[in-house]
């Protein structure tokens, strides 16, 4: 490694020096053994001194680190050699880790990886997803054996998606058929006002889009666990999503103008193409005028919505009321709420109770919606509602419709090329048939032994979280006890649900029993999926909550926490290097999947998760003292991350409010994982070093943690993500969390006042 000014770390010995040390050891025996002890002490000075262990425990940890490294040797297995090569290639050892650890850990990765033309962002996560999709392609295209019905349906759906010649031949025909089903698209037909417009009702239109096409437009009605009683389901009413990814794009700031213009051109082009396909006159001026009205309407809707950073407190969002109160408070110029909701539920043969209650999340939006509805004609409303359905279905049509959105996607994401077809199809099938596809992935690529190993890691990190509560002087004993109870009650799901591999278990086939796919009807297959997903959700209203239900599929590179279930989920897709391998050193496992485990556990105690108790019910279990001080501790982190200015996103600052929950989880996760690793060593765990890397165990832990987040963005997507992503940009996830961790600056000998060892640190958990 190259020495850098201000890098106050002793240079580690190279291979030649190690060879000499071995010879000297044979000759000098005990004398050099003392020297080795001294050398190791110099490499890892006071590694645990600021982790608030007791003095006795601190001594045990340091002794364990010494003994472990003395007894271990360099790992030369294929897995270790691959890990060493990956780490070395990703690093930029010319950079000072105390100045910018992200560049030190990821500089090589950034230098070696160019963002593909199809991607708006490219990262370690994206590469893992790409590799997973290659596996899924193989199993979905494998025709050598017959599978159970659910799996065969997934393969048929995949083949229909790949059947591009038929998709091109059918062109806009399937979409035009759907437009008739939803009452027509006024801008793309003649005489709508005199025909379909005469019997138009907003309530019925919204209900059809919701129940038949899973499009919750204008009003977001959905079924989910009741926040106040997690054992039952309830109807929720909330503000909707919009056609563009963020409400900010609808406003007239200079940097949004290009996106708005491209969006309007996209809308206009699609409507014009559909008119031509029906042999209607082009009517360019009329089409542009009506699509401009649609954009104006959607802009007013965007203005009526509440920014996401102001919606973090679920206790402030939650308002329970019966249908009569809903109607009285939000009449919306005669909008019949009972008719709307009943029409949605009738699709699954569910009847509203006379005293049915709903939970309204979007009160400010509904208060603003009345004036908007009153300002626009039925024609403009229908143009907007159907546009949102058309927008969703563009990807299922022929190539010329995809080409119509090229400029819009370029303005929004910076991409100029569509994803290669097989990847698009693999992703689509996995998203819609996650259990069936997951069963294929598990059989092909997942080691079942990983489940027990990860479960042990969860227990180690959960134990550290509980012990860390004693270090918090901002939290009183009453609240600490409740926090401990909640942490101990967190349930985990690892890898996959067992039933997807059980041939005698009919649940997997029953999950897709209502679906019948055809290889030459990809568009209609997609409509079946939309309807099935919508109705499967709506049916839950009268069903008891299944606490063992998986909220995500197995073939997914991610992890999750559900506050309503107090449950953490680690799909099989993330249980792979660099996150996890039973064949790589434990420093990498703790810095990888260990950090992820700590991250998800901490989500149970972030600015949203803290509002739910050990059973997943929204309940205030905090004392006034602890709640007040939690807010104060949070302000430190909001300020810290809010001061990160991202040059790639036009020098916009990270939104410390909207990213708070993820920042809390990142900070807690890496802190818990590191302490759990030290404790594992102290308890006799024997780790191994990697060949070719003069790095201590602690340094390997932090480098693997950082390299999980290596990645780069296109400028357009950087601008979008800073508006919409609840996560901080990748490099600030690393820098922010490690700046706050004393163990990091100790491991790399960063002087106080250096960028990675700031004078003030933030800590919540």
Curated annotation (Swiss-Prot):
| Domain Peptidase M13: residue ranges | 74-765
Q: Could you give a GO molecular-function term held by this entry?
A: metal ion binding
Tissues expressed in:
Highly expressed in testis. Also expressed in ovary. Weakly or not expressed in brain, lung, heart, liver, kidney, adrenal gland and intestine.
> Is Zinc found in the keyword set?
yes
Instruction: Kindly state which reaction or reactions the protein catalyses.
Output: Preferential cleavage of polypeptides between hydrophobic residues, particularly with Phe or Tyr at P1'
Q: Which cofactor does it need?
A: Zn(2+)
Keyword terms of this UniProt record: Coiled coil, Disulfide bond, Glycoprotein, Hydrolase, Membrane, Metal-binding, Metalloprotease, Protease, Secreted, Signal-anchor, Transmembrane, Transmembrane helix, Zinc
Q: Which residues lie on this side of the membrane: Cytoplasmic?
A: 1-19
Q: Which SUPFAM superfamilies match?
A: Metalloproteases ('zincins'), catalytic domain
Q: Where's the active site on this chain?
A: 600, 666 (proton donor)
Q: What is its EC number?
A: 3.4.24.11
Q: May I have one GO cellular component term?
A: endoplasmic reticulum
**Ranges in coiled-coil conformation:** 523-549
Detail which positions bind Zn(2+): 599, 603, 662
The regulatory note on its activity is: Inhibited by thiorphan and phosphoramidon.
Record GO biological process: proteolysis
Q: Identify the glycosylated residues.
A: 163, 279, 303, 336, 694
Q: Which PANTHER family match?
A: MEMBRANE METALLO-ENDOPEPTIDASE-LIKE 1, ZINC METALLOPROTEASE FAMILY M13 NEPRILYSIN-RELATED
Q: What does this protein do?
A: Metalloprotease involved in sperm function, possibly by modulating the processes of fertilization and early embryonic development. Degrades a broad variety of small peptides with a preference for peptides shorter than 3 kDa containing neutral bulky aliphatic or aromatic amino acid residues. Shares the same substrate specificity with MME and cleaves peptides at the same amide bond.
Family stated for the protein in its record:
Belongs to the peptidase M13 family.
Q: What is this protein called?
A: Membrane metallo-endopeptidase-like 1
Species this chain originates from: Mus musculus
């Amino acid at each position: 490694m190259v020495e850098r000014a201000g890098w106050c770390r002793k240079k580690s010995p190279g291979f030649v020096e190690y060879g000499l040390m071995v010879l000297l050891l044979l000759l000098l025996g005990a004398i050099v053994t003392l020297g080795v002890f001294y050398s190791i002490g110099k490499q890892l000075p006071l590694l645990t001194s600021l982790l608030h262990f007791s003095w006795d425990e601190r001594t045990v940890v340091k002794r364990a680190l010494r003994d472990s490294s003395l007894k271990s040797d360099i790992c030369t297995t294929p897995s270790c050699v691959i890990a060493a090569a990956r780490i070395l290639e990703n690093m930029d050892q010319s950079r000072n880790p105390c100045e910018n650890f992200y560049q030190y850990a990821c500089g090589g990765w950034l230098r070696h990886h160019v963002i593909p033309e199809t991607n708006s962002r490219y990262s370690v996560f994206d590469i893992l997803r790409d590799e997973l999709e290659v596996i899924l392609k193989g199993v979905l295209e494998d025709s050598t054996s017959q599978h159970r019905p659910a799996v065969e349906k997934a393969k048929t759906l995949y083949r229909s998606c790949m059947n591009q010649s038929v998709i091109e031949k059918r062109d806009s025909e399937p979409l035009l058929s759907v437009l008739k089903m939803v009452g027509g698209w006024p801008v793309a037909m003649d005489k709508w006002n005199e025909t379909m417009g005469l019997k138009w009702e907003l309530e019925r239109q919204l209900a059809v889009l919701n129940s038949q096409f899973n499009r919750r437009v204008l009003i977001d009605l959905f079924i989910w666990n009741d926040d106040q009683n997690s054992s039952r389901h309830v109807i929720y009413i909330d503000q909707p999503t919009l056609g563009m990814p963020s409400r900010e794009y609808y406003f007239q700031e200079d940097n949004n103008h290009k996106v708005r213009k491209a969006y309007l051109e996209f809308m206009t082009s699609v409507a014009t193409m559909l008119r031509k396909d029906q042999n209607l006159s082009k009517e360019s001026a009329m089409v542009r005028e009506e699509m401009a009205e649609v954009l104006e309407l959607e802009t007013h809707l965007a203005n009526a919505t509440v920014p996401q950073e102001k919606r973090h407190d679920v206790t402030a969002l939650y308002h329970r009321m019966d249908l009569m109160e809903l109607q009285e408070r939000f009449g919306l110029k005669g909008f019949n709420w009972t008719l709307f909701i009943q029409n949605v539920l009738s699709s699954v043969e569910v009847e509203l109770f006379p005293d049915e209650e709903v939970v309204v999340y979007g009160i400010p939006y509904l208060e603003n919606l009345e004036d908007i509805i009153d300002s626009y004609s039925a024609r403009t409303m229908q143009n907007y509602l159907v546009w949102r359905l058309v927008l969703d279905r563009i990807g299922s049509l022929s190539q010329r419709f995809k080409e119509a959105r090229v400029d819009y996607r370029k303005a929004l994401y910076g991409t100029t090329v569509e994803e290669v077809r097989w990847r698009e199809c693999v992703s689509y099938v996995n998203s819609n048939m996650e259990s069936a596809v997951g069963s294929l992935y598990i059989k092909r690529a997942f080691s079942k032994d990983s489940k027990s190993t990860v479960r042990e890691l969860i227990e180690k990190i959960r134990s550290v979280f509980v012990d860390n509560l004693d270090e918090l002087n901002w939290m009183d004993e009453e609240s600490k006890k409740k926090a401990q109870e909640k942490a101990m009650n967190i349930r985990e799901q690892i890898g996959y649900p067992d039933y997807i591999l059980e041939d005698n278990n009919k649940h997997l086939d029953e999950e897709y029993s209502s679906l019948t796919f055809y290889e030459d009807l990809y568009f209609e297959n997609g409509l079946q999926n939309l309807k099935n997903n919508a109705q499967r959700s709506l049916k839950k209203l009268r069903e008891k909550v299944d606490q063992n239900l998986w909220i995500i599929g197995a073939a997914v590179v991610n992890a999750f926490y559900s506050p309503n279930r107090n449950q953490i989920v680690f799909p099989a897709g993330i249980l792979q290097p660099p996150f996890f391998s039973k064949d790589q050193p434990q420093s990498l496992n703790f810095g990888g999947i260990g950090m992820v485990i700590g991250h998800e556990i901490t989500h149970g105690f972030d600015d949203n998760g803290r509002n739910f108790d050990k059973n997943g019910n929204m309940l205030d279990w905090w004392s006034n003292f602890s709640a007040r001080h939690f807010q104060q501790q949070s302000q430190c982190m909001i300020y810290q991350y809010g001061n990160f200015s991202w040059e790639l996103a036009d020098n916009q600052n990270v939104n410390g409010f909207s990213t708070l929950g993820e920042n809390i989880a990142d900070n807690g996760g890496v802190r818990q994982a590191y302490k759990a690793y030290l404790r594992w060593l102290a308890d006799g765990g024997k780790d191994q070093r990697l060949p070719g890397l003069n790095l201590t165990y602690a340094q390997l832990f932090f480098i693997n943690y950082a390299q999980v987040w290596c990645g780069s963005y296109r400028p357009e997507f950087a601008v979008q993500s800073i508006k919409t992503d609840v996560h901080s940009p990748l490099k600030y996830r690393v820098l922010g969390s490690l700046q706050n961790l004393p163990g990091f600056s100790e491991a790399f000998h960063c002087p106080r006042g250096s960028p990675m060892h700031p004078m003030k640190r933030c800590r919540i958990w």
